A protein has these predicted regions:
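Generic detector of leucine side chains in alpha-helical contexts
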Residues: 10-15, 33-39, 54-56, 105, ...
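C-terminal engagement/docking regions of AAA+ P-loop ATPases
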Residues: 70, 76-78, 87-90, 94-136
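C-terminal output/effector regions of signal-responsive regulators
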Residues: 23-80, 93-97
Length: 136
């Protein structure tokens, strides 16, 4: 259902309705989190960040290095390079921190040092994955 929203090029409101009206799978939880952070699905970094968060949410996935374990896997999936994946995720993190106030970030992410200063890609993705794991 959520993939239909992307394939049909619908907007964030349609995405939210698709997420809200169905069972909350890990993929939908990540989509909702990114929606709540006002990151548009049109950003390439949206897809890449979503994949990275989902990889880290998998209890069986062990990540020792983003540059060796995460970015190359996502790059291969999308026919891109690790450098482009990292750059687009950084752009997405920048967008999130540009459009959200500290209060908005606290409302979505909770009280955490991550809401005060823009974190690195690794810190942001790791934090989001851990937040979603704890909400299970």
């Amino acid at each position: 259902m959520v993939s239909d929203v992307f394939n049909e090029g619908l907007d964030l409101t349609d995405l939210y309705k698709a997420i809200k009206g169905s069972e909350m799978t890990p993929e939908k939880k990540v989509s909702k989190l990114l929606y709540d952070l006002m990151l548009p699905p049109s950003y390439k970094g949206y897809r890449y960040m979503k994949d990275a968060i989902l990889m880290l949410c998998d209890d069986n996935y062990v990540c020792t290095s983003f540059t060796k374990n995460i970015y190359p896997v996502i790059a291969e999936k999308y026919g891109s390079t690790s450098q482009n994946i990292e750059k687009n995720i950084r752009s997405a993190v920048n967008k999130i921190y540009a459009v959200n106030s500290r209060e908005d970030l606290e409302k979505t992410l909770g009280k955490s040092p991550i809401i005060y200063d823009k974190p690195s890609n690794v810190k942001f993705i790791t934090f989001c994955a851990e937040k979603l794991r704890l909400e299970r």
